[in-house]
Amino acid sequence: MSATLFEKWAKNPENLASVRDAIDATAFGDDSLEKFSQFVNIQRVKSGDPIAVLGGYDDVGKSGAGCNPTFTTGHIANTLKRWDLGDWQVAKKECYSAVLGTFAEFALHAGTQVGDLTDTEIGTVYADKLSKAIVRMIWRLAWFGDKAAKLVSNSGVLTAGTDKTMFDVCDGLFKRIFTQCASNASQLTAIAANGKSTYAEQKSAILAEGVATGILESLLMDADSRITSNSNAVVLATKGFTDALHHDIKVKYHINLPWTTIFEGFDVTEFDGVKIARVAVWDRIIKAYENTGTALNKPYRLVYADPRNLMVGSNADGLLSELDIWFEKKERMNYWYATGKLDTQLLEEDLVQAAY
């Protein structure tokens, strides 16, 4: 049987003697759970829990005075929606034979316990890498989830060959933002470059002089005054857009847009007093899963809102569940399992301005 784990690490004397001696590939550094939580509002909820928002009283005051006025009933704006948590699971199994023939074989137990990887360096590395993959799953579901997910071939946006069950756990924040902008066009600032038919055309269009700064200026002008007056509001943007913005400002004004790295990976800057955060995780997900092979689906995206308005809910204290790890003696198989629930909501749908 050929190795399926560490398959490129042949067990030769000149190779490493331990999995721990391998060098970790350079991490992106911006896709941790800590960074995810900086710009969303995480809630512990149950399916069916309400989100009730109380608005203002209808406008009042009509002409007239004197005795016997006409009395009418009034109305106070209000909305009610409910959480609808979807289930996610991660279920993995491995047999020790997956590492036979590689130098990871040196980490196996001897004798009867050879099949148990749980307390070996192999199991430690496996659990660590799997846990990080689960965090990336949270990013993917919370922002790109779609209960009606479809492949490009079925009039959807998912790349050919993608397993749609990796997305249909819940409707993510982008799905909710797209739906809201479809119902209220004033909340959308259009980006023409997204509609181009090839990667090169998309990039060329966004890099044209004045385009990126024009989009951002329009986004800020189009936004509800309750967003622009909110000191907590931030513009979240794909790396593709922020790179174009940096280029445009450099060309137009001959200055470099200053970026500050925070939270060990998030880059932020300010434009006309408004904070902008570069969310490169979005770009990677779009390139991996919303790619037709000739063009990307909305590679340039901006979301302008108070993070309090971007809600992510789970029924547990945190978004991540503890990874359950065990060795099944009868099957001589190692198992890793985690499960949880997830949903998203926009607290106030009218307090998001988007560009795409």
Q: What do these predicted regions represent?
A:
Residues 45, 54-58, 62, 144-148, ...:
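Charge-rich, low-complexity amphipathic helices
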Residues 77-182, 225-243, 327-343:
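Long, contiguous amphipathic alpha-helices that act as assembly "spine/axial" helices in icosahedral shell
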Residues 24-108, 128, 164-168:
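Assembly/oligomerization interface modules of large self-assembling protein complexes
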Residues 45, 54-56, 63, 70, ...:
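Compositionally biased, intrinsically disordered low-complexity segments
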Residues 67, 114-115, 296:
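Extended, non-catalytic structural segments that build the interaction scaffolds
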Residues 218-223:
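Charge-rich, low-complexity intrinsically disordered segments
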Residues 3-48, 164-217, 242-356:
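Sequence/fold signature of self-assembling virion shell proteins
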